[in-house]
Curated annotation (Swiss-Prot):
One of its GO terms (molecular function) is zinc ion binding. Keywords: Metal-binding, Zinc, Zinc-finger. A zinc finger (C3H1-type) spans 245-274. This is Uncharacterized protein C50C3.1. The keyword Zinc-finger applies.
Length: 322
């Protein structure tokens, strides 16, 4: 009998991107990824052919026959000079070498306005004025000694600015100093009499009295040297804290709070003691009606009253303060 063996199909060898020495068992060329420093993208690979003596099983027979001779003749440092094979790889961003639309617009704007975006070294924009050029030529032709032969000119004296002193500001020319003022000297007395009013002033006052703007009765009181203007303090309006400005309402804080009103006599509202006593009695009676004795389901003896399980409550009972 003949024994039939099932023929197995060899699997395709995986292609790695790492650089390895060509294996004797592998007949497929390796693909090695690299980063070129000449601006080429990463999606470029180079084929390393298999050994020359082995049978070629790859479709890239051209490179397998031709490249090994170059590798054998050249040294290890010359392998990078071999020809590169570029493969098209999907989903790779295309390198854009053209300028963008905004870059083109900016370049056109600079060209139209004659503006140099990045001027070269050693160049500058000079103001070429004919007047300045003529003046420079005349000055260059005029000989000027380096060291002056004559005496140096006198420095012009600057006029000192006017300083504002106390004598210029005030009318009196008394010397001011930082000495302590002597208060032992009494001030000059206040004048007891004033000059009589003039005729035009009297005529004006009589007209105002006829129209009723000024009252006809005026008390001509003599002025006092100590208090020369007593009417100034009499006509001053009293403050709101005084009794004449109190509101005809009872102060709520005075009748409700146990400590009375905190403002005292300066309060704007009235402080009625009778109303306060009546209100305090109502508050105390409402407290007595709302208070209930605490009933507990557990009875504690006098011995265990101060131990665990006993809870002290703050009572509003009128007998608690006794």
């Amino acid at each position: 009998m003949f024994k039939i063996r099932k023929r197995s199909v060899p699997k395709e060898t995986l292609k790695g991107i790492l650089r390895k020495s060509p294996s004797k068992t592998s007949k497929v060329s390796q693909k090695v990824g690299f980063v070129d420093d000449h601006g080429k993208p990463i999606a470029e690979y180079r084929d390393f052919p298999a050994d020359e003596g082995d049978e070629a099983s790859s479709s890239d027979s051209h490179y397998e026959k031709k490249a090994p001779l170059v590798i054998n003749r050249s040294g290890d440092y010359q392998i990078n000079r071999m020809k590169w094979v570029v493969y098209s790889v999907k989903n790779v961003k295309k390198q854009n070498d053209e300028p963008s639309e905004m870059r083109i617009m900016e370049e056109n704007r600079l060209t139209e306005n004659n503006i140099s975006r990045a001027p070269l070294f050693g160049t500058f924009d000079a103001l070429d004025s004919p007047n300045l050029t003529t003046d420079a030529i005349i000055r260059a032709r005029t000989p000027v000694p380096i060291i002056t032969s004559g005496s140096s000119p006198d420095i012009p004296q600057c006029v000192s600015p006017v300083q504002n002193t106390y004598q210029q500001i005030f009318e009196n020319n008394t010397d001011t100093s930082d000495e302590v003022q002597d208060f032992s000297i009494p001030p000059p007395p206040y004048p007891s009499s004033f000059p009589a009013p003039t005729t035009p002033l009297l005529a004006l006052m009589s007209q105002l009295k006829q129209r009723g703007i000024i009252s006809g009765e005026q008390n001509n009181q003599p002025l006092d040297n100590v208090n020369p203007m007593p009417q100034q303090f009499d006509r001053r309006p009293s403050r709101w804290t005084q009794g004449s400005w109190k509101v005809d309402r009872i102060c709520t804080y005075y009748i409700n709070r146990p400590d009375k009103c905190t403002r005292g006599d300066n309060c704007r509202f009235k402080h009625d003691d009778v109303e306060r006593e009546h209100r305090q009695k109502e508050i105390q009676s409402s407290r007595n009606q709302s208070w209930h004795h605490r009933t507990s389901s557990h009875k504690y003896s006098s011995e265990n009253s101060d131990h665990r399980g006993y809870r002290r409550h703050r009572s509003r009972s009128p007998h608690a303060r006794q």
